[in-house]
């Protein structure tokens, strides 16, 4: 059984939801980023969603854009990101790891080369943020060739065909976006039709649904789970803690530990 399937089976058996933090690899630099990721896992993260630094991210709001810039300014390349992932996988052989990145970074490695490298490291899933489902077939084929699970976003304005396509082609988990726009911890509004989308995705046998965008507080995790999703992803709120503590690494780790514990507690 693949890692995400194993995780969701374990969570279901314990009647828990999942909490999945997102951070950008190498933010604010390679060494501190490893400490940060270890802190997330050690304090209750059920899985990791990790981003590759990119100069022009499509869906990212100002907080995660700044994280990308910090990582790039620290000299982080795709090769360095893969090195960091190797280190994380070596320390945590069981935790599911999903990547979120833009297509240009994959093309720079070639499709086959990128997914082969992911498989060598032990990455579980890849979500390509700027490739719509209609153009995704080459990515799906390359991912499956190397045993990587392709993940797709279900946007809040998805029609029936989009919901069906996302459900059929996603593996590992399904990413449900809370609202239109870019990532943000400040904008915590959620689209009014999320309940309906959850029902539709489940009707089409989608993989377990993780809700992201604007998830910054434990109460929002509870609300997401009450709607029927399997867990919640928190990116901007996690990265804001890094941003607020760039000059105090120990406080950064302590604040992240408290944040993850509180968010995970909301899933119990």
UniProtKB/Swiss-Prot annotation:
A Pfam family of the record is Trp_syntA
Instruction: Check the record and name the InterPro entries matching this protein.
Output: Aldolase_TIM, RibuloseP-bd_barrel, Trp_synthase_alpha_AS, Trp_synthase_suA
Enzyme Commission (EC) number: 4.2.1.20
Keywords of the record, alphabetical order, are: Amino-acid biosynthesis, Aromatic amino acid biosynthesis, Lyase, Tryptophan biosynthesis
What the protein does comes down to:
The alpha subunit is responsible for the aldol cleavage of indoleglycerol phosphate to indole and glyceraldehyde 3-phosphate.
Q: How does it assemble?
A: Tetramer of two alpha and two beta chains.
Q: What is this protein called?
A: Tryptophan synthase alpha chain
Organism listed in the record: Mannheimia succiniciproducens (strain KCTC 0769BP / MBEL55E)
């Amino acid at each position: 059984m693949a890692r995400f399937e194993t995780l969701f089976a374990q969570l279901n058996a314990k009647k828990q939801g999942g909490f999945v933090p997102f951070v950008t690899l190498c933010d604010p630099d390679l060494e501190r980023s490893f400490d940060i990721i270890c802190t997330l896992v050690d304090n209750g993260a059920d899985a990791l969603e990790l981003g590759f630094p990119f100069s022009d991210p499509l869906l990212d709001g100002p907080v995660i854009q700044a994280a990308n810039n910090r990582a790039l300014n620290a000299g982080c390349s795709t090769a360095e990101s893969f090195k960091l992932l190797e280190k994380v996988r070596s320390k945590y052989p069981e935790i599911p790891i999903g990547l979120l990145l833009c297509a240009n970074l994959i093309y720079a490695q070639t499709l086959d080369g990128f997914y082969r490298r992911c498989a060598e490291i032990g990455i579980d899933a890849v979500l390509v943020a700027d490739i719509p489902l209609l153009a995704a077939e080459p990515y799906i084929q390359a991912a499956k060739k190397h045993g990587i699970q392709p993940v797709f976003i279900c946007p809040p304005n998805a029609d029936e065909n989009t919901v069906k396509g996302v459900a059929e082609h996603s593996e590992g988990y399904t990413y449900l976006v809370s609202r239109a726009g870019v990532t943000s911890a400040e904008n915590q509004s959620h689209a009014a039709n999320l309940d309906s989308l959850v029902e539709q995705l489940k009707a089409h046998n989608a993989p377990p649904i993780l809700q992201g965008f604007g998830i910054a507080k434990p109460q929002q995790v509870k609300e997401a789970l009450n709607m029927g999703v399997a867990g919640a992803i928190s990116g901007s709120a996690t990265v804001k803690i890094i941003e607020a503590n760039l000059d105090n690494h120990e406080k950064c780790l302590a604040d992240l530990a408290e944040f993850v514990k509180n968010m995970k507690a909301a899933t119990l």
